[in-house]
Amino acid sequence: MNHRRKEEMTMNKKPSRPQVNPNTLKRLLGYLSVYKTRVILVVICILLSAIANVMSSLFIQRLIDDYISPLLLEANPVFDALFRAIIQMACIYVIGILASFIYNRTMAVISQGILKKIRDDMFAHMQTLPIKYFDTHTHGDVMSHYTNDTDALRQMLSQSLPQLLSSCVTIVAVFISMLYLSLWMTLFIIVFLFLILKVVKSIAGKSSVYFIKQQQNIGDVNGYIEEIINGQKVVKVFCHEEEAKAVFDKKNQELCDSMTTANTYANILMPIMGNMGNILYVLLALVGGSLAIAGVTNISLTGAGVMTLGTIASFLTMSKSFINPIAQVSQQLNAVIMALAGATRIFELLDEESEEDHGYVTLVNAKRENGELIECKERTGLWAWKHPHSDGTLTYEELKGDVVMEHVDFGYEENKLVLHDINLYAEPGQKVAFVGATGAGKTTITNLINRFYDIADGKIRYDGINITKIKKDDLRRSMGVVLQDVNLFTGTVMDNIRYGKLDATDEECIAAAKLANADGFIRMLPDGYQTVLEGDGSGLSQGQRQLISIARAAVADPPVMILDEATSSIDTRTEAIVQKGMDALMHGRTVFVIAHRLSTVKNSDVIMVLEHGRIIERGNHEKLIAEKGKYYQLYTGAFELE
């Protein structure tokens, strides 16, 4: 596939430096705005915590110069003032601890609330996406939006952002405090800081590139795992285990390499910063001691004075409080960049265009009154198309199942048609079968009828109404679909049947199961209709899963049925059981059948043979056999269906 080739080419490229989209930050702030009051509380608590941290460093200078040094000179020292100062400092510490607890707890609530809202938005938007999106994106990659990308956001919101803000506030507060103590030593730290920032920029810049690459690789690995799990039977049938493992090993190695490189850069940052902090600590002690011994005038925000022992000790403590937040900022920036990469992917999903629907004709319950159709609220078993007109009037057209395609062209890609000039007319109650090799366009036609895709040219009419005028939900509600690949959901058998009509009663579900010949095996399950299915109905045979799928389509009692290769994966005995139920289900309905087994379409009213997106033959079984064309060759085995 083209996207696979593109993926492989991308894998071999050196990752480029990520560009942070300002719009991503703006949209994240939009989610934060809902918690405005709590965010203000968090900011206040972070300020209190940072101030408490700085005051503890300043207290050392006061403790040494104002209390300890004078007490050392007294013959009978009185410690009352020292004890009061220590109690005051203890109170400040308690305030700092409480502030830290409150902002961490509050940020946990905010972050989880935001993530819930983002997941809700993603899931709600995903329901509006066209089938084309899921045909062009691996399920594993879509799933990674809900797992890896949201987890990266969680870490940023609950940990990185608060720590980033706290570190920035601490840096500013400590810097002001250092100016309060000594201008000369502050200037020395600033000079040393330029060297530190150069190291941080080099390491953080490289790690951010590989953190972005890591997120991309995680999506690739998840997508491949999901693909192999779903196709595990095919893998084993064709003995493809070693090849699958080789491909996975390659993708996993690429993930390992990007994670190793990213974390190597990220993990060496703190040790390097710690050692540079130790070097600064020693140098400050030397500079401060030299200034004090030389009697250099100490200049600060409070004026000029002498360099005291308390000032030097306090400055040494502050150097740690200054360097550590800088290291934390650089480290948290990596987490923020990775989270923004995840957020960008999330917003790309949210920005995907929803399925367009400009229809205005709706499907309503109806009844006849004085020979005319009128809308009613109660279920009558009679449905009608409610058609509003520009002059304000309403007309009602009975839902019959009359389907017409006129000169229809279609292509999944622009200027690359896969269907050419398709014309068909299915009268209510007719059974129309499509026959042809894989890729001939059989399934594509049914996808156009229920508007999973829109045609490039021509018209499709449903009961005389152009289907572009019918709301998609109502159009699809009027059709029953049975696919070869059955999807069952976690829940009871009854719930899975009711999926076809959410307001169906238990009696209606059981009647649908009987019609599909599924009632017998369902009652033999441990809890009958209340048996809980898990893992896509993994405990059921393929035939049983297919029967439940047919019952699910039958419960809605639609006038049009689409059977997309519905019995091609069932054994002959089960097919006979299914076919008996299907014959009853198809009675009086317009039915479109796609099957590889020609025996299932032999009794169709019209059989259409497709080749390369064109209808090359049409007619009933007897007519096509008499013509001795492509259908005859397929039926007699001269050619095989693919």
Model feature map: region roles:
Residues 1-53, 68-85, 103-107, 111, ...:
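Membrane-integrated ABC transporters
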Residues 2, 39-102, 179-184, 286, ...:
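Transmembrane helix-loop-helix hairpins at lipid-water interfaces of multipass membrane proteins
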